[in-house]
């Protein structure tokens, strides 16, 4: 009897395996961290073999710990850290060098060079992305330049590229399948999100052979089966793939245009479903593919805030104002409001929609009456203001008024922050019962492809909300606070 869908969540710091039942409830979780490699400042790498062995290990641990047999698993869904780049030898299955992680800045000079040649508009128009070291394309170029003989081998079709989803599928199928999905392909700087094909012009600019790129398929389809001689002992369909942020959008059941989710982690990642319409941002956001499903491609606008939970870490580790991030709610709640104090966390510059990399952080509006609680409250509120900045840019780009914001990530347990977020946006904020929205999204995509669940409507009905926060603040007061934030931002940009 097929009772479960297995989600593999290959993240930036850990690999996880999570089992979901037909009610989309979590049956079991196994997780293990792997090594972060920092060869020099600004560089970040992972060892692909270690990532695979860690992922393999957590699957084995999950099955053993919860006494689940592979016969009970209907299918597998995969979600992954996006953009991280692996290049491996087709014949040996071994990577030619460490994976270059999405956070790695080593290809920034190459991006600058391409911008100087006036190529950024070409990339933006075809891929929806900005020319940045974040995305995979320049990482592939770096590997082909630095590994002896790599370019020649790639041209002969002897080397393969993949993001982490592709690498896991290759290993799960013992090298039989080289595939990715629309959402991951759309993060490479090489995939044309309008024609839905690897773009010959962009491949030519970066001199990347088409032969090394995976086949691109919808996010919910049977890609193939696990090797019978592998971990599971018999074939299991691999039926869902999506990049982590897109998977979270799907896991939050943001199926309709105008629905958005915000993940509050170290930074914030916001995605707005724009339906089958592709909007090109005029406000520094990126356009991306959310997923491919039911013969349709769904697009999204994405914006990120660099500093969210990281501000709480700063209050804890550097300023020593709190002992744990959770303390922030207690101290912030001891004052009625921010007392005119604003904290602009531009520690590494300001992201969307300002894009000022030279700006630096500041605490403004201090008076003799300001105390530690005001500063802690201002730090919390900065997450909500930055979220509104991005959502206003999304509304301006798409003309889609936000109906509801779904939230996930570590900071959403903070009720004061969630209520303030609802107040400052003027829309309802929903916190889900299942906070594992990324893994749930991968499970949903796989489950739909194999008939484990019948439709998106069924999934929407299963989505359980833990708590809803409705706006309570008067309009005039809300706008006064937000104007104060803008004034503080202007001060650090001058």
From Swiss-Prot:
- Record's protein name: Glycerol kinase
Q: Which residues bind glycerol?
A: 82-83, 134, 244-245
Query: What pathway is this protein said to act in by its record?
Result: Polyol metabolism; glycerol degradation via glycerol kinase pathway; sn-glycerol 3-phosphate from glycerol: step 1/1
Instruction: List the lineage, top down.
Output: Bacteria, Bacillati, Bacillota, Clostridia, Eubacteriales
Gene3D superfamilies according to UniProt:
3.30.420.40
What top-tier enzyme class does this entry carry? transferase
Q: Does the keyword Hydrolase apply?
A: no
Gene Ontology biological process: glycerol catabolic process; glycerol metabolic process; glycerol-3-phosphate metabolic process
What the entry lists under InterPro entries is as follows:
ATPase_NBD, Carb_kinase_FGGY, Carb_kinase_FGGY_CS, FGGY_C, FGGY_N, Glycerol_kin
Q: What does this protein do?
A: Key enzyme in the regulation of glycerol uptake and metabolism. Catalyzes the phosphorylation of glycerol to yield sn-glycerol 3-phosphate.
A GO cellular-component term linked to this record: cytosol
Q: Which gene encodes it?
A: glpK
Q: Does the keyword Kinase apply?
A: yes
Enzyme Commission code(s) on record? 2.7.1.30
Domain of life from the UniProt record: Bacteria
Q: Name one GO molecular function term.
A: glycerol kinase activity
